[in-house]
Amino acid sequence: MPIHILPPQLANQIAAGEVVERPASVVKELVENSLDAGASRIQIDIENGGATLIRIRDNGLGIAKEDLSLALARHATSKISCLDDLEAILSLGFRGEALASISSVSRLTLTSRTAEQKEAWQVYAQGRDMETTIKPASHPVGTTVEVANLFFNTPARRKFLRTEKTEFAHIDEVVRRIALAKPQIAFTLTHNGKILRQYKSAVEIEQKLKRVSAICGEDFVQNALQIDWKHDNLHLSGWVAVPNFHRPQNDLSYSYVNGRMIRDKVINHAIRQAYGDYLTNEQYPAFVLYLDLDPNEVDVNVHPTKHEVRFHQARLIHDFICQGVGNALQSEQADFARYDTPASADEIQEPAANWHSSLIKPNRSAAGHNIFESASDKNISGANTYSHGSAKINRFSTKFAENIPHFSTKSVSKTEQKLYGNLLTTPAEAKKNTAINAESENSFEKNVSTPQQSTQLSGQFLHSLALVKNQALLLQQGQDFYLLPLAKLQKLKFELTLQQPDIAQQPLLIPILFRLNERQLAQWQKQKNFFLQSGFEFDENPAQHRITLNKVPSCLRQQNLQGCVIRLLEENHEKISDFLTALCNQLQLNEIHVLADALTLLTEVELLLKTQNKIQLAQLLISVDFTQYLQ
C-alpha cells in the first residue's frame, strides 16, 4: 500500500482512541471547555449511562458565529497561539482535539450564543470529510453540546462499554472530581431525567466544607485537617484526614495542580511518605489537596487526556508536599487547646506566592480573559494554617509552633524477645541478661545481653549463617552462636556516622523554621553545640524564639527532621553521647529483607568502628545455646 494522507474522519477517530475512552471522558472534556469559557453554572444531562445522550449546558461567554466552523476542526483553539502560551498553561484545555475527536465517533451538535449576538447558531459535522453545517437556533447566552449515539460508527469500541450503571458511576466520579476542583461553580447532574447530584456555588469556607462533605462524606470532614501551606511560589491547600481515618482502598484521594485534576506519582509518593509509619501497606490516606505553582514550572502537555503532568523541580515539589502534610499530621497530635486563639501577625511571615503577576502573559481563551488567574490569587491570600474538623477551626502557624511530634512506640526489645522465644530457648542466665537489656536499651553502651570480652573475639571471624525473620543476623564463631539485632546495628551506624570529624551535610530545599516555647529555647541554648557537632546547621533568632534548620547530616536526609529536633529540645541532655543516643532512638530504620543487605550494614559499621571500639559491636551480640536441643 503506498503512503497516503488519512481522511479527516479516520484521523480524528484515531485521535479519539486516546481522548475518548468512555462516556466519562466526553463529560470531562466538555465540562472543562465550559469552565474555560467562564461558566458559573453547568448542567450535565446523561441518558443510558452516556451511550445514548450526553448534554452539557453552560452559561459561559459562548462562541461567535464566525468561529463555529472552526470549533469542530482539529487543532483549532483560542487558548494558545505560540510556544510561550503552551509553556504557561492555566486553562484546562489547549490542544484543540476534543470536539473534533468526539464528533468523529458520535453525532455531535454544538449550539452557542454570545452576549453580542441577537440569535444563537448551531453547528454539526458529518460525512467522510467532516464538513460542518451551521444554522440558526434558539439558545440563551452560553453553549450547549449534545453528544448522541456515542461510538455508533465504531462498533468495536461500543462493545467495550460496560453496563449503564457502571458507565454512569464513572461519569459521577468525574463530576465529583471537577466539583471539588471548582467549588465556586454550580453543577447539576441528571440521569435519565432524574436529578442525582446538585452542587451549589461555594465561596465561603463553610460552603466549601459542605461541598467536600457532600462528595467525600461527613466522616471525612470531621476527621480532616485543613492545610494552607506556602513557600515562595508554591502553595498547598486543602484537607488531609487524620491517620485513624484510613481507607481500605484508594477511593478518597483527590489531588489538583493549578485547578487541574491529575494523577501524579510524585504527589502520591510525597503524601504516602508524609503518613510514614501511621499507615500500613494495606491502608490508604484520604485527602483533597490543591497545589498552585508557577505554570512555567509544570508541563501539562504530557498526555492527550492531561491526567499526567511533569514538574521541572520534582524533588522540590515532593519535599514541599511531604513537609506540609507531615507537619499537619504532627500538629494533629498536639494539644489543640493551646492554639484556640487566632494566629498573630508575627507568626505568619512566609511570603505569599506572587507568580500571578502582570509579568505572566495570560492564556488566550475562548472566554477572552482567563478567569482562573484572578481566582488563584484569591485562593493564595491568607495565613498558613492547619485546621481540624468542621465544628472547630484551629490555627497553626507554618513556623512549626511548638509541634509535639508523634512517634511509634514499638519496642525493639519485645520484638527481639518474641523472635528469640519462637526460634529457640536460651539458658536461664542469657534470659536474665536479655531482660536487663530490655530495660536499658536507650543507651548503646548498655545494650548487652550476654557480656562478651573483646579478647574472646580477637583473632577469630564471625561467620554469617542466616537472616532471622528480617530482624537479626545469626552468626557463628567456632562452636558459639550469636544473634545480632539489626535495629540496634542500624542505630549504632547512625551514632558512629554522626561522630565522624567531617560529617557530610546536605542543604534543605525548604528550610524548616521552628517557633520555640520558653523551655525549648532554654534547651536550645544548652544543646545547640551538640546539634552543630552532629552536622546540623541553624540560623537562630532568640529574640523571637525562632530557629531555622538549613543543613542536616546527609545520613538523616530522609528522616522526620522537624519531629526529631522538637523531641530533642523537650529533653535535657548533659553530654553529647546522651544527645546522640536520644537522636538515634528516634530515627526511622530501614527494613532489611535479604542477607546481602544485612551483611552490607555490618560491613559499614565495622569500617566506622575504630579498633579500640570494637567492643561496641561485641556488646550487641546475644549468645544462643543449642546444647539442650542436641542432648
Curated annotation (Swiss-Prot):
<dbReference type="InterPro" id="IPR042120">
    <property type="entry name" value="MutL_C_dimsub"/>
</dbReference>
<dbReference type="InterPro" id="IPR038973">
    <property type="entry name" value="MutL/Mlh/Pms-like"/>
</dbReference>
<dbReference type="GO" id="GO:0032300">
    <property type="term" value="C:mismatch repair complex"/>
</dbReference>
<dbReference type="GO" id="GO:0005524">
    <property type="term" value="F:ATP binding"/>
</dbReference>
<dbReference type="InterPro" id="IPR014790">
    <property type="entry name" value="MutL_C"/>
</dbReference>
<dbReference type="InterPro" id="IPR042121">
    <property type="entry name" value="MutL_C_regsub"/>
</dbReference>
<comment type="function">
    <text>This protein is involved in the repair of mismatches in DNA. It is required for dam-dependent methyl-directed DNA mismatch repair. May act as a 'molecular matchmaker', a protein that promotes the formation of a stable complex between two or more DNA-binding proteins in an ATP-dependent manner without itself being part of a final effector complex.</text>
</comment>
<dbReference type="InterPro" id="IPR002099">
    <property type="entry name" value="MutL/Mlh/PMS"/>
</dbReference>
<protein>
    <recommendedName>
        <fullName>DNA mismatch repair protein MutL</fullName>
    </recommendedName>
</protein>
<dbReference type="InterPro" id="IPR014721">
    <property type="entry name" value="Ribsml_uS5_D2-typ_fold_subgr"/>
</dbReference>
<dbReference type="Pfam" id="PF08676">
    <property type="entry name" value="MutL_C"/>
</dbReference>
<dbReference type="InterPro" id="IPR020667">
    <property type="entry name" value="DNA_mismatch_repair_MutL"/>
</dbReference>
<dbReference type="Pfam" id="PF13589">
    <property type="entry name" value="HATPase_c_3"/>
</dbReference>
<dbReference type="InterPro" id="IPR013507">
    <property type="entry name" value="DNA_mismatch_S5_2-like"/>
</dbReference>
<dbReference type="GO" id="GO:0140664">
    <property type="term" value="F:ATP-dependent DNA damage sensor activity"/>
</dbReference>
<comment type="similarity">
    <text>Belongs to the DNA mismatch repair MutL/HexB family.</text>
</comment>
<dbReference type="InterPro" id="IPR036890">
    <property type="entry name" value="HATPase_C_sf"/>
</dbReference>
<keyword id="KW-0234">DNA repair</keyword>
<dbReference type="InterPro" id="IPR020568">
    <property type="entry name" value="Ribosomal_Su5_D2-typ_SF"/>
</dbReference>
<dbReference type="Pfam" id="PF01119">
    <property type="entry name" value="DNA_mis_repair"/>
</dbReference>
<dbReference type="GO" id="GO:0016887">
    <property type="term" value="F:ATP hydrolysis activity"/>
</dbReference>
<dbReference type="GO" id="GO:0030983">
    <property type="term" value="F:mismatched DNA binding"/>
</dbReference>
<dbReference type="GO" id="GO:0006298">
    <property type="term" value="P:mismatch repair"/>
</dbReference>
<dbReference type="InterPro" id="IPR014762">
    <property type="entry name" value="DNA_mismatch_repair_CS"/>
</dbReference>
<dbReference type="InterPro" id="IPR037198">
    <property type="entry name" value="MutL_C_sf"/>
</dbReference>
<keyword id="KW-0227">DNA damage</keyword>
